[in-house]
Each structure stands twice: as C-alpha cells, then as structure tokens.
Amino acid sequence: MAGGVTGGSAEGWSKRFEEGLHPVIERFNASISFDITLLQEDLDGSIAHARMLGECGVISLEEAAQLEGGLEKIRSEAAAGEFQPGLVDEDVHFAVERRLIALLGPVGKKLHTGRSRNDQVGTDLRLWLRRRLDDLDCELERFQNALLTQAESHRQTLIPGYTHLQRAQPLCLAHHLLAYIEMIQRDRDRLKDVRGRVNISPLGAAALAGTSVPIDRQNTAAALGFECIYANSLDAVSDRDFAVEYTAAASLVMVHLSRLAEEVIFWASEEFAFVRLSDRCATGSSLMPQKKNPDVPELVRGKCGRVFGHLQGLLTMIKGLPLAYNKDFQEDKEALFDTVRTTKDCVEAMSILMEQGLEFCSERLAAAVESDFSNATDVADYLVAKGVPFREAYQLVGAVVKRCLDEGILLCDLSLEQWQEFHSAIAEDLHEALAPKRVVAVRISEGGTGFDRVEEQLRHWRSRLDSGVS
C-alpha cells in the first residue's frame, strides 16, 4: 500500500511514513485482488462492531446508525457493480474504510475504534468459511443421495469385487456404492467438527494485546453467530489452525471422490465396460471420432493435487511464525479460497455424474462375475462346513484353481466326479453354493454384502437422508 506522500490509501497509515511504496512493492504487498472475496463478511463484521461501539457508549447511537447506513450503502453499491476498489486500497478492509469516509466524512473514521485489521481479517475469514462449510455439507448430502439412488436401483445387481485390482469376491453393486456413502458421511462429520473451531470470534483482540477501549466482545460474537470468543488475544489473531483443518478435511473429501473417479474411469473403459457414460457428462476426441472420454472423473482425480498442495502450503507457511500476526498470513486466503471452490466443484460434478451421467451395464456385470474364480473362497467355506480345517480347505481349493487354469475352465465346469478327486466330502450341493448370487447372499455378517444386509443399509440411509439427519 502507498505511504504518506502518495494520497489515496495513505489514510490507512500514520504520518510516520514520509515516502510512498515503490510501485512494484505496492503491487506485491496488495491483496485486494483476492480478498475482495471477503467483502460481504467484512461489511457484516463492521456493522456488528459499529452497533457494539454505540451500545457500549464508545460512540453515539446516532453515529453507530450512520456507520451502519454507510456500510449498507457500500453493500448496495457492490451489488450494483459500483464499488470498485483499486490497488491504492491494498486490501478489502481499507477499501471499505476509504469509501465509508468518503460517504460519511469524519464519522467514517470512527469505525476502526477498538479493533485492528488483524482481528478483523480473522473474523472475516471465519464468517466466510463458516458459510462455505454449510454449502459444502449440502453438496455432500446431495452426492450421498445420488449414490443412494443408484444403489437402490441395483439391489440385486452383482459386480466383481477386487483386492490388488485382482478379482476377489463378487459383491452386490448397491453394497459397493454404499461404501462411498459411508466415506462421505465421515467427511461430513469431520467438516462439522471443523465448523465448531471455525465458529469462534477473534473480534476485539485488536492487533495482538486487546484494547483499552471499553468494548464488549461477547456482544459482537453473539451478533455474528459465533459460539464463543477466543480467550487469548495473541492466539486469536495468530490462529490459522481452522484453515489447515478445513483443507485437511477437504483433502480427504477429494481422496474419496478420486477413488470413485478412478473406478469410474476403469469401469467406462472397453476392457471393463461396466458403465456407459452419457453424452452430457463425457467429451470426444479432436482426432478419433469413436472416442467418449471420462473427463469428469479424470478432472476430479487431477484436481486432488491442487487441494493437497494447498494443505502442504498452509502447513509450511504457518510452521515458523512467531506470535502474533505476520504478513505471511496473507498467503492463507488464495489457498483456502481455491480449496473451497475446487472441492465444492468436484463434489457437484460427481453428483451430476451419478445422477445423470452414467448407467451400469447389468448384463456385462453379470457376465463378469460368472467368468472368474471369485467363488473360490466359497468352496473353502463349503469344505469348512463339512468339517475340513480352513487351511487345509484353502490349500485344496488352490490346487483346484490351478487345474482349472491349466485346462482353461471354471470351477462351475468341473463335474462332481472331478471335484471328488480332490475331497470325498464334496457333494452335489456344491454347484448351488458356487452360483454368484448365492455367493453374495450368504455373506450375512453385519456390514456384509448379503442382500438382506444391504437392504438394511439401504433402508437406514434412505431414512437418514430423508430426515435430514447429518
């Protein structure tokens, strides 16, 4: 920001400065290009502060009303596109104050009584993030509903289950989708926990030591909807834990989105062909006319790196800062703003993908689970039920699979006589036990993929989401 001799933003500084900032340094120092994002929150915080000053007798009630009117005038100007801060303002706080003084004259200069930009920006940032946390929770709930709707449509559809990206055991497709609903619920729980630590007011901590002005911090905290105030003024102006916590929680949201995105990319390939992408959620190639590319999940997967990078950047920025406020904190905003925007955009895109962007190919999925050895564990379980020790059964089934691979056949292709070459306990009922739907149905342990257990979870989640319980 310019110094005392340049005019304009000089109103923000004391007469200690005789020379203005070098133009390059002025641009380097300014944050108005991005912290203008906090304008509405800055106005809200300033109105609460002005009212409190009036109620505490620091300024007259008439002056407080004038300040509030001026701040609302700025809000109206911003909505009409008439409030145009420039580099001379340095940041959103000086931009508002400069315009307020232009509107009200000397009364406008009283707004900053009893506060500093240090507690002011912390207040603005918390108000802004609190609102975005609520927005993100709504988007995550929508995503859960999209997943649940898909799951409800595939109660009896089977899909290969994988470990190490190798066919493992067949699953109910609804069970697979329900796993992501559980992940997203953990994300929502984490973000709710973060919100509690966002919702603490630093306003009134001033620069670092509090103020001699007889203000009422509880008053402004209540007016702005904060649950409580920071107990220590140094901590109040230097705390950015909440920004790190949000970015860490958002990183986990992105991890979960990326895992599903990766699966959709696989599923949409010709090698899998488990899903068909709609024209509304896919793009083509500029060269190859046959292509339909899964751009949505690919972008979600790619954007994870941005959010992870912001988390690392915030941690690195904060780790060496002595108390209390340091200009380094200016770097928190772009990282936080981009994390919020990127995460919300990715959740919204994946919701649309689930709602109208893909169709599961039930026939292809059925064929997939009938063409592998993912029922091998059930042979072992069958033998265990016949009294064979599990490890012995495990070794025996491995030998059977080896023989089938050598002969190019599946377990279901073996005759009873061939099975009994391996163990005399095997009877005709084995073939029924190997049927894919039977393999899934018998997984009856709580949380398992058995159809009855899946129905329980579908009912649970439908009731929970319909009732709005977060």
Swiss-Prot record:
One of its GO terms (molecular function) is argininosuccinate lyase activity. It is found in: Cytoplasm. Its main location: cytoplasm. GO terms for biological process: arginine biosynthetic process via ornithine; L-arginine biosynthetic process. Keywords: Amino-acid biosynthesis, Arginine biosynthesis, Cytoplasm, Lyase. PROSITE patterns: FUMARATE_LYASES. Pathway: Amino-acid biosynthesis; L-arginine biosynthesis; L-arginine from L-ornithine and carbamoyl phosphate: step 3/3. It catalyses: 2-(N(omega)-L-arginino)succinate = fumarate + L-arginine. Its EC number is 4.3.2.1. Pfam families: ASL_C2 (PF14698), Lyase_1 (PF00206). InterPro entries: Arg_succ_lyase_C, Argininosuccinate_lyase, Fumarase/histidase_N, Fumarate_lyase_CS, Fumarate_lyase_fam, Fumarate_lyase_N, L-Aspartase-like. It is an enzyme of class 4 (lyase). Belongs to the lyase 1 family. Argininosuccinate lyase subfamily. This is Argininosuccinate lyase. It comes from Prochlorococcus marinus (strain MIT 9303).
